[in-house]
Amino acid sequence: MANQPSVAVAHLGCEKNRVDTEHMLGLLVEAGYPVDSDEAFADYVIVNTCSFIQAAREESVRTLVELAEANKKIVITGCMAQHFQEELLEELPEAVALVGTGDYHKIVDVIQRAEAGERVKEVSPEPTYIADETVPRYRTTTEGTAYVRIAEGCDYGCAFCIIPHLRGKQRSRSIESIVAEAQQLAAEGVQELILISQITTNYGIDLYGKPQLAELLRALGEVDVPWIRMHYAYPTGLTPEVMAAIQETDNVLPYLDLPLQHSHPEVLRAMNRPWQGQVNDQIIEKIKTALPDAVLRTTFIVGFPGETDEHFEHLCEFVQRHEFDHVGVFTFSPEEGTPAFDLPNQLPQDVMDARRDRLMALQQPISWQQNQQEVGKTVQVLIEQEHPGSGQLIGRSPRFSADVDGLVYIDPGEAPSPRLGSLTPVQITDADAYDLQGQLVSQ
């Protein structure tokens, strides 16, 4: 074991990619490979790439080029490896291996073959693999939080999205498998589980013949983890059964991440979104009625081909009317291989940028107002960082999810400092459009 080459991982992209990274690290550690946190000292650098939009690809390419210039042995994994197989091998002679999105569990074998002098290409044309609770995992998140992937892949065909091509068809894990992993994480002291997949509300449809998210949430309610949070909930999948499960399961937070993408029926139809534009107002009102304390996050795409001034004004009015807690806005990115790539009436980048900036400016006072309502409350905060000099603590309250929302900055005062990764009561004293300020409450 002493002669095993060392490995570092450069992680790029989404939290689904992060779970892949963590499983690769877990498998390598189990096989006796030393993992180095500094790429400069590692024999091999695994670059887990993202290929979702142009900006993500550019970041992946920059990372690969920097490592190639440093003469590193590079193992390219993730969505870009799935997407641009031959191009990457041709352009980067330093790449000793290429591993697709459905093949990351073979990482130990790939490194062994590369060590023997083979240039490895391990890419399944149609990814079908999904790791379960038996696959080793080395977590890279803060102590208190873990992502739990409940399904992989997607059966929809949204016009702008390359993900089904890169990740394959939907395949769900069993409820028993997910609960077993949740129990393992609870035993490690994890306080927050974030459930992820491409479409969380479609969970189980491939395995059980119908969506089983409500049943999964109730099963996870038996696990000793204080916070369970969902990402990527499609509005049409928020059935009365799912709403009831959120309402009645104590550790499931009333936090909904809804990738709405637009409000205008014509744009939604052009996007080939599953609800074809029939939604959005009624569903938002239903959610707010069923879950009055719900925190709503959403994302929108501006500048989709053919989006008119009228379409955009419709979206602005929609955002002002519904007063979401958190909004992310992206400009349309034409992805080769998707139907939207060849659509007529593509908008200039400066028009798209201006629309994004205007929509974000409209949202800012709404987010400020929503955060102001927290001032004076005492809330549970998951402590994630401590400033070494000032002792200031940084964490998240239930209304903030990891990496995408705001933070709570805490003056420790005279109270003893809580452990990183623990939940502690904090009185909120101030707020801006993004973050909260607070003080520890003596216990």
From Swiss-Prot:
Cofactor(s) listed in the protein's UniProt record: [4Fe-4S] cluster
Function: Catalyzes the methylthiolation of an aspartic acid residue of ribosomal protein uS12.
GO BP annotations listed: tRNA modification
This protein's UniProt keywords: 4Fe-4S, Cytoplasm, Iron, Iron-sulfur, Metal-binding, S-adenosyl-L-methionine, Transferase
Annotated ranges, domain MTTase N-terminal: 5-116
Keyword Transcription among record annotations: no
Locations listed in the record: Cytoplasm
UniProt-listed Enzyme Commission number(s): 2.8.4.4
Catalytic activity entry: L-aspartate(89)-[ribosomal protein uS12]-hydrogen + (sulfur carrier)-SH + AH2 + 2 S-adenosyl-L-methionine = 3-methylsulfanyl-L-aspartate(89)-[ribosomal protein uS12]-hydrogen + (sulfur carrier)-H + 5'-deoxyadenosine + L-methionine + A + S-adenosyl-L-homocysteine + 2 H(+)
Record's cofactor remark: Binds 2 [4Fe-4S] clusters. One cluster is coordinated with 3 cysteines and an exchangeable S-adenosyl-L-methionine.
Gene3D superfamilies listed in its UniProt record: Methylthiotransferase, N-terminal domain (3.40.50.12160), Nucleic acid-binding proteins (2.40.50.140), tm_1862 like domain (3.80.30.20)
InterPro entries: Elp3/MiaA/NifB-like_rSAM, Methylthiotransferase, Methylthiotransferase_CS, Methylthiotransferase_N, Methylthiotransferase_N_sf, NA-bd_OB-fold, Ribosomal_uS12_MeSTrfase_RimO, rSAM
Domain Radical SAM core: 140-370
SUPFAM superfamilies: Radical SAM enzymes (SSF102114)
Family in the record: Belongs to the methylthiotransferase family. RimO subfamily.
Residue positions binding [4Fe-4S] cluster 2: C154, C158, C161
GO CC aspect terms: cytosol
Record domain TRAM: where: 372-442
Source organism per UniProt: Acaryochloris marina (strain MBIC 11017)
Amino acids binding [4Fe-4S] cluster 1: C14, C50, C79
GO molecular function, one term: aspartic acid methylthiotransferase activity
Keyword Phosphoprotein: no
Protein name: Ribosomal protein uS12 methylthiotransferase RimO
